From Swiss-Prot:
May have a role in the remodeling of the endoplasmic reticulum upon zygote formation. It is found in: Endoplasmic reticulum lumen. GO terms for biological process: cell development. CDD domains: WW. Glycans are attached at N41. It comes from the Eukaryota. Keywords: ANK repeat, Endoplasmic reticulum, Glycoprotein, Repeat, Signal. This is Zygote-specific protein 3. Pfam families: Ank_2, WW. One of its GO terms (cellular component) is endoplasmic reticulum lumen.
Amino acid sequence: MLRSAGRVAAVALLALFALGCVSAAAKPSTDRLVAAIKSKNLSAVVDALSVKGLDVNTPDSTRRLPLVEAARSRDARLVGALLDQGALARVSDGTTTPLHLSMQGGSAAIVKLLLAHGADPNAKDKTGASARSTAAAVKELADLLKQWDARGAMAFEDEPGAWIREERDGQSYYWKPANGESRWAVPPSCAWQRVTVQGHPIKYINSLTGQETTRVPPALAWARVTAADGSALWLNWASRVASAAATAPAELPAELAAELAMHPNRRWYNTATREYVYTDPAYATPWRELVDEASGAPFFFNVETGDTTWELPAALAWTEVIESSSGADGESGSGSEAGPRYFHNTVSGEVAWSAPEGSRHVFVEASAADL
């Protein structure tokens, strides 16, 4: 009886294993896709990409990666088609990367596409050479690298508001009204997330390109405002574009969009520069006050330099002082009024008669009537 039960269990396990093998074997191959890429047949590539369940980051039966072969073809249309379907720009076949091939070939259009999707010009190939070191002597490539060095992948993102997100078959679908471009994979400008962890400074991470920043990226620089005629608008204060759409901009994650919608018309006036800002004055300096998890004591972290200190930084040490004026007889009476107003830095000892630029005192929260 026990032998019979064991035999049945073994047969069942073998059946499950066989099903697993069939399932694995049934996974769509990229052989047809790579063949279409090698022949530079765009319509065949589009047809191969339409196969349900296809993973464009899977090598074919001869270990060739679709995006590497597309870069080798020097056809920007093929590279763009793969990136639109979720191909990873940072991929490597163990020998080279798409960016190495495009840099060597002087293909500026492809290089821009790859950098925009997270390719790293400092990544190395099998020989240890970085992609930037193999670049052909082409001015356009030098300009692209200069932009990347200054701002990273976000230098090549679409302008905020360029994409519209819709739901189709339970999936997010993106299209760009300006040129009719459409894609299922999230565009780089729509892949930003705000990351908040207790005891750590807020940071922003692009889930597609991997770029991180402690400052609000242009893609997320949206505010909910009320126009002069009373209509509600989404305003991108970084790029100075507005959207009258009822739905939140495609760049905003749902949680952040809901938070902004709850606090419409919130902004601050900088009395020094005479400009309005939409970011909390608490972030006017790179210093953030955090709490040490072990001791519970406060400490300060500089998001730009990475420095930490237990002492209050001078940039945060400005206090406003208002002296009371005394009466004509030199005594302060019950009817005394506010006297001279100045600012004192408790760390550096400096004194200023006007609110120091960069301190929280220079900002005044604006009312809705100021809009």
